[in-house]
């Protein structure tokens, strides 16, 4: 049976204070709950980023501080993908969800290009959940990450994730 890897990358900087931070925590809990009751084999990897990247747990309170350094999150994601490739021999398909506040620091391009060399990332489904208004450099990051504007969303529901997982497993 195929394993579906779900990589949830989120902004944990000062930009998520208030409503955006609450929505990120809520989304992480919903995604975790949806995957707990999924009949398919799934793995959830939650990566937060600010000045440094870190792993988060599904029902953990997220402190908002630091700068939104997306390159740090991409480095951590690259490390996780490399580790998974070394130790996972089963066929896997991946969904990447990037939850952003709408601000990204410069320096992400090199890390994103490295990720596109990774087969799992290049052929995975990539979505962005965006809050706030994005400036020009952030819009470029959003479009380069997803490659299609239809995958830049304002909300990502449990139902959408469950149907994606089902389509991946059956397809």
Where are these regions (language model features)?
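Phosphate/oxyanion-binding active-site loops and adjacent basic polyanion-contact surfaces
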Residues: 19-24, 65-75, 108
């Amino acid at each position: 049976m195929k394993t579906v890897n779900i990589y949830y990358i989120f902004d944990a900087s000062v930009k998520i204070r208030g409503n955006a931070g609450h929505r990120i925590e809520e989304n992480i809990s919903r995604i975790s709950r949806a995957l707990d009751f999924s009949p398919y084999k799934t793995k959830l990897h939650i990566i937060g980023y600010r000045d440094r990247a870190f792993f988060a747990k599904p029902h953990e309170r997220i402190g908002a501080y630091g700068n939104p350094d997306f390159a740090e999150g991409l480095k951590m994601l690259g490390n996780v993908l490399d580790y998974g490739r070394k130790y996972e021999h089963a066929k896997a398909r991946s969904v990447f969800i990037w939850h952003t506040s709408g601000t990204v620091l410069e320096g992400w391009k090199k890390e994103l290009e490295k990720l596109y060399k990774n087969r799992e990332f290049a052929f995975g489904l990539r979505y962005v959940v965006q809050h706030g208004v994005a400036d020009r450099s952030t819009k470029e990051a959003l479009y380069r990450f997803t490659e299609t504007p239809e995958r830049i969303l304002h909300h990502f529901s449990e139902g959408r994730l469950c149907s994606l997982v089902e389509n991946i497993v059956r397809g």
